[in-house]
């Protein structure tokens, strides 16, 4: 991948790039299994349990995406300082992102613990009593895990900024082994149902968080935090981190709020539609694991190239990595369309009605993913790595409210559309985002941004 001659030494030779990408693919595959294991094992309790977990996970994803966006801001700043050979500022930016995420995650956790019932009722309105009971149980323990998720995301992003993706992969492996083992023991061994699934996820996330923070403090780590004094707020660095993190956080937050609005709409279609949507969401996430991994890699690669002043290399690597993301999307989604979708659905205890709806939306997902997913989600990370987060935020917010929310509500409320209509709104969102991001990339405006 790095045979092209540059005016200077390639920053990411093929072996180094492979060493970055392969653990990221494994990490993404492992991280998805937490949601899959919960949904799969909880499905033995019944559709009401699956629906309750699904509704809460929609909100959980909102929080995780906002925290990931803030971590991305820190990773972009740290990677550019690393590329610029400013290790002191890189370490200082690492400390600041840990501070930011500690404060944010603790505040959100406190709000959810106190007001979880009001939040669920306000977002999803009137839902079945059994679904609400399961959702409240799962929501409480999910909230307690937010600080662990926040600090884990920060630590993992900082390791990736250094080009070390093995640490986050191994932490994800430990997290998944504990989660799946805990699910098996607590759900099937002790009959704890949704409570068991939530408790297993909480314990696994706490262990992963502790492991990443411990490794971040090892003497050989470039971004090691040098004492608690380093965690004191630094206005200059916080501003630089938030210049990327806030637009990305608003983008991800508004994106998930849009999904919450759509989830609320989905809940009006009945328990079968909620369960089908949950299973389709969980299984379809697997199909874009390679493209998601490339999306994480470009933050490190493009960030370090631009930090070193190598715009030519940044463009070259960005193009090749985007093509790699497309290759992964084609292989995964075509395989699923012809072979894997029906097999995947047999793993879940769905009613015939829910299974038919899930299969329908998954196959449409396969078709649109091979053309639009990488340019809609991998490509904007290239722009963010350059500090062009405000543009990606603006496009994503407009597209989400017009297509993902507006179109869906129009189809369901005015034309009595079903679950597929909601997913079609999502696909239109991808198309619009892809066009805007591709035009921005080709014109080169993203290269004019400054982070450090």
Which role fits each region the language model picked out?
Residues 62-65, 179-183, 209-213, 286-289, ...:
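Hydrophobic transmembrane alpha-helices of multi-pass small-molecule transporters
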């Amino acid at each position: 991948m790095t045979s092209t001659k540059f005016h200077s030494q390639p920053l990411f030779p093929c072996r180094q790039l492979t060493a970055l990408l392969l653990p990221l693919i494994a990490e993404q595959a492992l991280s998805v299994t937490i949601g899959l294991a919960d949904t799969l094992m909880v499905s033995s309790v019944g559709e009401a349990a699956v629906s309750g977990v699904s509704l809460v996970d929609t909100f959980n994803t909102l929080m995780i995406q906002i925290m990931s966006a803030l971590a991305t801001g820190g990773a972009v700043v740290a990677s550019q300082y690393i590329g610029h050979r400013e290790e002191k500022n890189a370490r200082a930016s690492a400390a600041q992102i840990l501070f930011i995420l500690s404060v944010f995650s603790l505040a959100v956790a406190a709000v959810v613990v106190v007001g979880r019932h009001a939040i669920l009722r306000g977002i999803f309105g009137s839902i079945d009593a059994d679904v609400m009971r399961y959702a409240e149980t799962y929501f409480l323990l999910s909230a307690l895990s937010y600080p662990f998720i926040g600090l884990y995301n920060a630590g993992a992003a900082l390791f990736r900024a250094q080009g070390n993706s093995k640490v986050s992969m191994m932490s994800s492996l430990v997290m998944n082994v504990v989660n799946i083992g805990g699910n098996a023991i607590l759900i099937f061994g002790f009959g704890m149902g949704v409570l068991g699934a939530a408790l297993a996820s909480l314990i696994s996330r706490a262990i992963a968080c502790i492991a990443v923070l411990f490794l971040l403090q090892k003497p050989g780590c470039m971004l090691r935090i040098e004492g608690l004094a380093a965690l004191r707020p630094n206005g200059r660095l916080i501003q630089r981190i938030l210049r990327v993190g806030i637009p990305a956080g608003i983008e991800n937050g508004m994106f998930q709020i849009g999904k919450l609005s759509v989830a609320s709409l989905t809940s009006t279609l009945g328990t079968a539609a909620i369960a089908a949507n949950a299973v389709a969401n969980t299984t379809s996430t697997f199909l874009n694991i390679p493209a998601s991994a490339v999306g994480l890699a470009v933050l490190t690669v493009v960030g370090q190239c631009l930090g070193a002043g190598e715009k030519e290399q940044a463009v070259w690597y960005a193009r090749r990595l985007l093509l790699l993301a497309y290759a992964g999307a084609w292989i995964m989604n075509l395989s699923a369309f012809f072979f894997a979708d029906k097999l995947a659905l047999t793993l879940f205890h769905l009613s015939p009605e829910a299974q038919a709806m899930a299969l329908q939306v998954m196959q449409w997902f396969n078709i649109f993913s091979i053309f639009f997913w990488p340019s809609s989600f991998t490509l904007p990370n290239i722009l963010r790595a350059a500090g062009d987060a405000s543009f990606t935020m603006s496009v994503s917010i407009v597209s989400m409210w017009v297509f993902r929310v507006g179109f869906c509500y129009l189809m369901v409320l005015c034309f009595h559309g079903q679950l597929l209509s909601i997913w079609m709104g999502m696909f239109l969102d991808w198309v619009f985002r892809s066009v805007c991001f591709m035009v921005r990339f080709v014109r080169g405006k993203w290269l004019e941004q400054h982070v450090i």
